[in-house]
Structures are given as structure tokens and as C-alpha cells.
Amino acid sequence: LYMSMQAFAPCLSVDVELGVAPSAAAMIRSVFRVADAEMLRDVVSFAFPAVASYMLVGEDVEALQSLMQSLAILCEKCPHDILGWHDEHDTPSLQILLRIIERLLCMDEQVCGQAFGKFLVALFAQAGSMLAPVMPALLHALVAKLAQATMPDCTLTLLYALAYLMAHHAEAVVAQLAATELEGGESALVTFVRRWLADVLYTTTPDMLQEHMTALMQLFQHWTPSLQHLFVDGDVLPAPDHVIMTRSRAKAYQQYEQIPASTKVLKLL
């Protein structure tokens, strides 16, 4: 394993020939998948700096997605080793990982797909209370990106990450989002809940959907006054009887009844 990392890690560079970095990243991901935790512990101090260095400067989407999956695997298989690592300047790995997340959130939406979501949740699960000092900024960044997201993969990824935090830290998350104002004056909580209730059922993976349902239950139990007057789309309203509708026209016409957000949560549950 160490020899393979010695071969692949130097290829994670923006200076190598086109196609080399994504190939090396894919190989690293494949090796991490089949390696057991004990083997991975021996290469964290060598592999993590190479992976992190590329992710802080690299632009290749394919390479970045493979490396996000690699980091998720490291977080799951040897969390104490990766979170306990420091660089030569005594910078903790968590600080480096948060810089990576910040950079990825500033990049094109196609970078923030399923691999990004799995990386985020794996890190959230293992870092736990270590994230407390940066949670306000992290939540703000995630919801701000969600507010601008147009691609389904990016939207569902951000919703999944936020749902995980809601499911496991509901009281703190609700309080922080309610106190965070986004551009335009709307609270981050209202923005998140509106988008969440609109798109959550597009989730098709059973375990992710279960996480969403757990999170929605937690949200309902921590309902706040700021959500009392939030109305969202409910059922599709029937077309007027006097209008002849073709299939395409009916789809374009679709209008929804407006229902309280709390009612929509109960319907989803």
C-alpha cells in the first residue's frame, strides 16, 4: 500500500500532463476502498498531505470527486488518525479539511455532487464536537450555496449534509440558522426549510431518505416562531374546468396550493 501511494501521490499535481491527476486520484480511491483500516493508518501521514494539497489548488472535477471519496473513506476507516494529524507547521488536519470545503463551495456546482455530500457527512460524523467553533460559518456557507444552487445533484447534496446536522444537532442547528441572515434579509432557517420541503422527495437512496425523515422529525420538535408564517407548495391544484388542456400545457400550467410548512412536514413524515 505504501509503495502504491509513493507511485500515485506525486501525480496529484496541476503541473502533470492532462489526465494524469484524475487517473492517479481514481487509483488512490480504489486502493483506499479495498485497504483495511490498519493498512490505511500506516499511510495517512503520507497520503493525506498529497490529497489535501491537490484539493486546495486543483481544478479537474473528476480528480476532485475521486479525492473527496478518498477523504470520506479515510474519515470512516481511520478517523482518529486523520483527525489527529498535523502538518509541519502544527496546522491540524481539520483546519485543512475546512479550507478544502470552503474552496469546493466556491467552485462550480458540478463539483458539489454526491461525492461531496458523502465527504461532508463522513467528516461531520467523525469530527463531532470538534466542529462546534466553526459551525456558524459552516452552516452559513452551506445554506448560502443552497440558496443559489440550480443543479439537482448540488441541491440534494447540500440538503443531505444539512439534514445530517439537523438529525444529530437539531437544537444548535435551528438556533444558529434562525439567527443567521442571508443576502436579501431572509433567515438561513427559512431559506433552508423552504428548499428542503420542496426537494427532499427527489432523494432516491433509502438510507439518505431515512436521514431526511429523522431530520424532519427533529425540525418539527424544534419548531420556531420564525417558521410559523412560512407557507410552501402543497398539492397540485386542478386545472379550471372550462380550459382544454394538452399534456404540455397542463405541465406548464401546474399551480400548487399553499400550505403551512409545518403541515408539509407532517405530510412528508
Write out the residue ranges for each language-model feature.
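Karyopherin-beta/Importin-beta family HEAT-repeat alpha-solenoid scaffold
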Residues: 1-269
